[in-house]
Structure formats: structure tokens, C-alpha cells
Amino acid sequence: MGKLLYHKIYDSHVIHEDTNDDPILYIDRHLLHEVTSPQAFESIRFKNRKIRRPNKTFATMDHNVPTIMQNIHSIEGMSKIQLNQLTKNCKDFNITLFDLSHPHQGIIHVLAPEQGIILPGMTVVCGDSHTSTHGAFGALSFGIGTSEIEHVLVTQTLRQPKYKSMGINLFGTIPPYITAKDLILFIIGKIGHGGASGYIVEFYGDVINTLSMEERMTICNMSIEMGAASALIAPDVTTYNYLKNKKFSPNKTHWNQALLFWNTLHSDHDTNFDKIFNFDISNIKPQITWGTNPSQVISIDQPIPKLEIFTDPIERKSVIQALNYMKLTPNTYLTNISIDKVFIGSCTNSRIEDLRSAANIIKDHKISNNVHAIVVPGSKPVKKQAEKEGLDSIFIKAGFEWRLPGCSMCLGMNEDRLNAGERCASTSNRNFEGRQGRGGLTHLVSPAMAAAAAIAGHFVDIRTYF
């Protein structure tokens, strides 16, 4: 009997099993940022402990950093304290830090893949929910809490349960204007906000095979929004081509040896998932969320659902609460809804392909007078490449603000946020109440849809608007 990809990686990293507790896994990569790591380091100092493998630990500054000007001396309050503390912690414990002055600084889930830090078959952890992004490389990746961060820093291990397995097969032909963001929003809408709870999801099929690494990262990034513990995509030639010649990828001497191992990282034919979903994506339309979780999503040409279709009283109550918060009513078309802000960025959609997609829509247009729009590249290399291609000029000429790398408006933790009542077309991954700022109203869309909304001043169907 063969094994699933998930089981191959999991089993190969078990270093201790206990009948009364979850197995202990060895961790290959530990990613840090300024928000969830300070308490862990404080505890380590208090207990006079050492970092087990600083060479397998990588840190960046992303959540709290301003995106207008990135001078640490100009930052104030808790943000400055956390950034300074991260600098000290990394220096004291000899951890690689991509700080604000580093040419590779950026969002941790953008930076790590583009530097080749994440490789197929690895176990990866980070104190961030969207660590599942790295499953796009066939790496088993988990978001962890502060106490677990401390444990991994000190032991390079972590207890992890063995989750159930879910296979999601995508087949068909991707329609024009449809992006990876549309695919994953569609899937979340079908499976539900908690439909994958307790599962590791593997995405596979002909459609997955055609996607770029950046598109695969978008899909794995948002798998957490349907409750999955993490997500995986088996590595293939697309993966290998992406990783070749990256800073931390295997060098020429070790490349062929790495390929031999990576080529074993797939789910064997004679094994089964605990649950399987099959989706024909041939007729998917541009997706947009209307509520306060990513599963409350519709096609752009559909009205907001009527309350009658929600027969479960708990779900119905949740829908009513979401509609009240979002200031929307059932049976309304979102193409009739005006917006105030547009945010193109986040660890979901801030890579070069995302910016190209948005710029392709924006080119030779101006944004609406009533819209404030910003573009935030996911890393300095992304920003540099975009400027080399002239994308920054396209955005600036259209009326967008061209910002510096960071998490930015994805979460209301820095200077970029929504004011109460402001409605935003956002390429981020979460639309919970207050996620982008207290009282802010978030609609999740693809970069192309966000760009089109910026031009029109309201949501539009990009298939027919231009």
C-alpha cells in the first residue's frame, strides 16, 4: 500500500512517538516576524536557554512596518518596540534577519519562497496563520502560537497530531479573466468556512498542473480559510524551475540529488484520501465576498443570497449579522455597490504576477475620483522587478499610491487601515469584522477585479466592463 504526500512528509519527520500524546516532528524551517516572536525570546532569556538551530531560523519585518516610509527611527509606539526587539533577538541569537534595510525584506510568506528557503519535503512553521502558503512547494507547513514558537526555537521540534486527509481535484479549462484567487474563493464557498477543519488538504489535477508557483501559493495560502490545518501541492517541473538558482536552494553539486528525492514527493496511486472533492472549474466566474468570512462568496453576476436559502438557524443568524455589518441586503448585486478604497497586496496577492495582472487592467485608465487606491509589493525584489517592467509608472499614472513592502492593509495593525464605514476591494485573505480596521467593510477579490473596481468606483464584471 502506498502513501499520501502528507503521510510521506509527516512520517519521515517523526522523531518520537508516545501512546499518550501526539508524535514529535523535526522542523526543517522556522520563520519569524516581529509580532508573535517577542514573548518567546523573552521566555528563552528568562530560562537561560539556547536556540537549537539558528541556521534553520529566518526572520523578517512585515506586519507592523509602514509602507510609505521605512525608516525604523520614524516608527512609533508598540510597532517600534517590536521591531527593535526583533533586531536585538536575532542579533543575540545569531538568526538571519531580513530587516528594513535588507534588499530582500518583505512579507515572510513572499520572501521565504523567493529566496529558496522553502524546499519540497520540508516541515515549516511560523507564528502566522497563512504559513500554509508554503504547501505550494510540497512542504508541510503550519501556523503556530507563541508557546510553540519558543518550543521550536529551543528544540527544533514540535508535537503535531496526524490529521485526516482531503483531496481536492480541479479539472476542466480555466476561463478567461479567472485567476487562482477566484479558484480558491470558489472552493471555499463550496466547502464552507470550516468544511476542511481537521484535515490536511492536497490540491491536485490537470488544472493545478498548469498553475505557476505564484498561483499555487495563492491557493495554498487561503486553504486555512476553509478550516484546513494546512495544504499541499506535489512538486513538479514547475516547482523545480522556480527553485533553481535561488539563494538557499541546493547548489549545482547537490541539485540532482535533491531532484531524486523531490520526485518521490507525490501521493501514490494505490492510496486513498479520507475525503475527496472534484471541481470542474470550466464555468467559474469572477468571485467576490459579500459577508464577513471568505465562504460568504458569490460570482460577480449573482445577487447576494436570499435569507430563505439558509435553513440552518445558526448559519442564518451568522448571515444576518454579516449583512448588517457589511451594510448590505439580500438579493442585491454588488456591481451596484460603490467602494472607497482598493488594496492590492498581502501574502495572498502581492507577487509579481499579481501586480502584472492588475497593471494590465489599469493601463491607460484613471481610478475613480472617489477611490483611494494603494499597491503594496510583497517584497523588495518584487518591487524592484515591477519597477524594471514599468508597472509602478502604470499604477502611479492611474492614481494609485506605489508603496514599500509590508503586510499593510491586510490587517489593521499598522498605519494602513480602513476607517469605520469605508468599503474596500481587497486582494487579501480575510474579511472578518474589523480585519482591515475597526468598522471597515472588506470584499475579497482578485488583483484584476480590484483594479477594475478602482477605475469604475464600484465593483464590476471584468469580463464585460472593458
From Swiss-Prot:
| Residues noted as binding [4Fe-4S] cluster in the record, renumbered to the chain | C347, C407, C410
Reactions listed under catalytic activity: (2R,3S)-3-isopropylmalate = (2S)-2-isopropylmalate
EC number(s)?
Answer: 4.2.1.33
Q: How is the cofactor bound?
A: Binds 1 [4Fe-4S] cluster per subunit.
Mind telling me which PANTHER family this protein's record contains? 3-ISOPROPYLMALATE DEHYDRATASE, HOMOACONITASE, MITOCHONDRIAL-RELATED
Protein family per UniProt: Belongs to the aconitase/IPM isomerase family. LeuC type 1 subfamily.
Tell me the HAMAP family matching this sequence. LeuC_type1
Name of the featured protein:
3-isopropylmalate dehydratase large subunit
What gene codes for this chain?
Answer: leuC
